[in-house]
Amino acid sequence: MNKGQYFWNELWCEGRISFHKEEVNPDLIAYVSSLNIPAKGRVLVPLCGKSVDMLWLVRQGYHVVGIELVEKAILQFVQEHQITVRENTIGQAKQYFTDNLNLWVTDIFALNSALIEPVDAIYDRAALVALPKKLRPAYVDICLKWLKPGGSILLKTLQYNQEKVQGPPYSVSPEEIALSYQQCAKIELLKSQKRIQEPNDHLFNLGISEVNDYVWCIRKG
């Protein structure tokens, strides 16, 4: 287990998961239509944790594929929502699945890409910003390989003064987004908003009082 894997496993084991939200993300509800997902389309949720957004997407009629490093997160997800799953193990990857939900427990960078069928859309609420800068290019490449031509990504990022603190969540500038996805057909900024950090926010406790939130729709050519 490398340093990054140990870090995330420790957070889940100790219950330090302030990044997990109990409510469906309002930006997903507001902007999911911009993805133009076909009926019964496949949606990838990378670094999914136990996000309730996955359940919301399933209830909209989509097939959700989640990838998560920490098995405890997936086990909590299926237990908390009383989901009856089947199990499978392929190499180092463990799979929990139903007819419309496919959850992989593995390092996304080590997952055999052939195990993920092409998806119609990707929903990234907190995956890109969870990764240090040196890993983000590889992450983008992997996700784009899984995305069908013409498919779209709903991506949430944030930006703050990195001189004060390093993430996660990491600050990702609009310039980095433009560079990272320059091979795509369209990069559209759907939302840009300043947000004052509340005392229970992780970044507030690290000395960050204000962040810029961004929501992007990125379409693959």
Swiss-Prot record:
CDD domains attached to this UniProt entry: AdoMet_MTases
Catalysis: reaction(s): S-adenosyl-L-methionine + a thiopurine = S-adenosyl-L-homocysteine + a thiopurine S-methylether
Annotated keywords: Cytoplasm, Methyltransferase, S-adenosyl-L-methionine, Transferase
Keyword Ion transport appears in the UniProt entry: no
Residues holding S-adenosyl-L-methionine: 12, 47, 68, 125
Biological processes, Gene Ontology terms: methylation; response to metal ion
Main location: cytoplasm
Keyword field contains Transferase: yes
SUPFAM superfamilies registered for this protein in UniProt: S-adenosyl-L-methionine-dependent methyltransferases
Enzyme class, broadest EC rank: transferase
Xref: InterPro entries: SAM-dependent_MTases_sf, Thiopur_S-MeTfrase_Se/Te_detox, Thiopurine_S-MeTrfase, TPMT
Entry GO terms, CC: cytoplasm
GO MF, one annotated term: thiopurine S-methyltransferase activity
Taxonomy, superkingdom: Bacteria
EC number(s) stated in the UniProt entry for this protein: 2.1.1.67
Subcellular location: Cytoplasm
PANTHER family assigned: THIOPURINE S-METHYLTRANSFERASE
Similarity remark: Belongs to the class I-like SAM-binding methyltransferase superfamily. TPMT family.
HAMAP family linked to this entry: Thiopur_methtran
Protein name: Thiopurine S-methyltransferase
Taxonomy of the source species: Bacteria, Pseudomonadati, Pseudomonadota, Gammaproteobacteria, Legionellales
